[in-house]
Amino acid sequence: MKNTIQDKTKLVNSVFSKVYKKYDLMNDIMSFGSHRIWKNKFLDWMNPQLNNTLIDVASGTGDIAKLFSKKTKNNSQITCVEPNKEMYSIGKNNLKNFDNIKWYRASAENLPFKENTFDFYTISYGIRNVSNINQALKEALRVLKPGGRFMCLEFSKVDNEILNKIYQKYSKIIPSLGKYIVGTSDPYEYLIKSINEFYSQEEFFDVICKNGFSQVEFRNLSNGISAIHSGWKI
């Protein structure tokens, strides 16, 4: 089990080290810009208030942190956590003008923060890349304040049969698209594989509940291409 976890950690790190320079561009192209709409809906449901504290895990290029800061008129304290060196550097540089945002390199399974610290914990398109999802959820629960909220945005299972057939066919061309734009298809073959192997909405709902969260619910976006899961620390 330990070797399997270590292998996945190395694989994921290698994937992001290959795509970091064109990460945002590929996201825009692959989703036809939809990922930006989904992220805004994510923040709308979150509805953060002034002076809230956020830990955003697997922050990538900093989209969620930036939207959270905008929602709170920059009157919030945001902690971005990113395990990959190259993604960390790009994200930190992207948000260098935000005095309320701090960056740390760490894994979702081992957060360097005290318990009961944050009002919100977010992870956007990152949870399926985590080597030990149960441990990551336990860490999320630990660092949230009582009454704090866990929110996850992730690719999920399409709930419309016709759309799903189109989606599956489109998914098969994404590695070729990646090779043309990034220069290698490997990261995008991993992307499609990781999406197909990840939990359904209902399965992930159960996993979140089993790791101690209360009032868990989810919402589908674009017929389940992506889904938002929410849970509370009570």
Regions found by a protein language model. Name each.
Residues 134-149:
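A short glycine-rich, Lys/Arg-flanked "PGG" loop and its adjoining helix->strand segment in the class I
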Residues 1-24, 170-171, 181:
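N-terminal, positively charged/glycine-rich alpha-helical extensions of SAM-dependent methyltransferases
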Residues 10-11, 81, 153-207, 211, ...:
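C-terminal alpha-helical "lid/dimerization" subdomain adjacent to the S-adenosyl-L-methionine
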Residues 32-50, 67:
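Conserved alpha-helix/loop element of class I SAM-dependent methyltransferases that forms part
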Residues 109-121:
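A short acidic, Gly/Pro-enriched loop at the edge of an enzyme's catalytic core
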Residues 23, 121-122:
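Hydrophobic beta-strand segment of the Class I
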Residues 53-110:
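Class I SAM-dependent methyltransferase SAM/SAH-binding core
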Residues 211-234:
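Core SAM-dependent methyltransferase catalytic element
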